A protein has these predicted regions:
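Short linear/disordered segments characteristic of secreted peptide precursors
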Residues: 8-10
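A feature for loop-to-transmembrane-helix boundaries and adjacent hydrophobic helices
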Residues: 20-281
Length: 281
């Protein structure tokens, strides 16, 4: 059926819903650095430190609730952070931005360029070494670790959000960040875009609530870390399809997937294996 021009809504009316959505996106902002004498603390570093502290404190508290000695988790925190930074930087260099390997100074600058999954890999390696050397059964502490890691990682991801480190594709979604036109000169892109740091943080905080509810109701005991692996692996795999490829510092892709998406297969395998092992026990 033909629609006459007189029956069509005015162009301004047709554009109004889109304009409303654009009006409610998150405005671009930057948090200033914190200067402490000769030291400068960047916003990301502050949230990363808070995340590590929160994860360690919550995990230790949960271990105590279970009648376990919390000191191994407090001692492990330093191991986990050190190994996480090293592996996080190496994964960033070798998988995300291998072009930077041509400059040996970048390879040694461990504080510049970190992959969250590389950090996770470093934490896993540190956990294997630490718990074996201490002859402590890791499974006893797995639930406590899950309850600490989820909110702690979420806080660290807020650090990614406040520096807008992971821009996504353009969108009019209400949780998008509106990068101003002036950002094109400094960042190389502008417009309303998904911000994957925010999405990751919201997902992890949600997972923390789910795990806490399961724990307090006595459900899936001994399986919370596996549940976290399955939930985060799924959310991260889906979120990474929203990552921008039209920005100057875009993540590398391999057969259409980011390195993190391949790591998600490892999380799924670990989660499924742990759940199956618990069922057979």
């Amino acid at each position: 059926m033909l629609v006459h021009a007189a029956e069509r809504p005015p162009a301004s009316d047709r554009r109004r819903p889109h304009a409303i959505l654009r009006a409610i996106v998150i405005p671009y902002f930057e948090l200033p650095s914190l200067h402490l004498g000769p030291f400068t603390l960047q916003a990301f570093g502050l949230f990363a430190a808070l995340g590590v502290y929160a994860a360690a404190r919550i995990a230790a508290r949960e271990a105590s609730r279970r009648g376990l000695d919390p000191r191994p988790l407090s001692d492990f925190a330093l191991w986990g952070v050190a190994s996480g930074v090293v592996f996080g930087h190496l994964v960033h260099l070798f998988l995300y931005h291998p072009e930077e390997l041509s400059d040996w100074r970048r390879a040694l600058s461990f504080w510049e360029g970190l992959s969250s999954f590389g950090g996770l890999l470093g934490g896993v390696v540190a956990a294997v070494v630490f718990f074996r050397r201490r002859t402590i059964r890791f499974a006893n502490y797995a639930d406590a670790l899950a309850l600490g890691v989820a909110p702690g990682w979420g806080i660290a991801r807020v650090g990614c959000f406040v520096i807008h480190d992971h821009p996504g594709v353009r969108t009019s979604f209400p949780l998008a960040v509106e990068f101003p036109a002036s950002a094109a000169r400094t960042l190389g892109f502008s417009g309303a875009r998904h911000d994957l740091g925010l999405y990751d943080a919201l997902a992890l905080f949600s997972f923390a609530v789910v795990l806490l509810v399961l724990d307090r109701r006595g459900l899936l005991r001994g399986r919370l870390l596996a549940i976290l692996a399955l939930m985060y692996g799924t959310s991260r795999f889906l979120f990474d399809f929203l990552r921008a490829s039209d920005v100057p510092y875009a993540d590398a892709r391999y057969l259409g997937l980011t390195p993190a998406q391949y790591f998600c297969f490892g999380l799924w395998a670990y989660g499924a294996w742990q759940l199956k092992k618990k069922e057979e026990a």
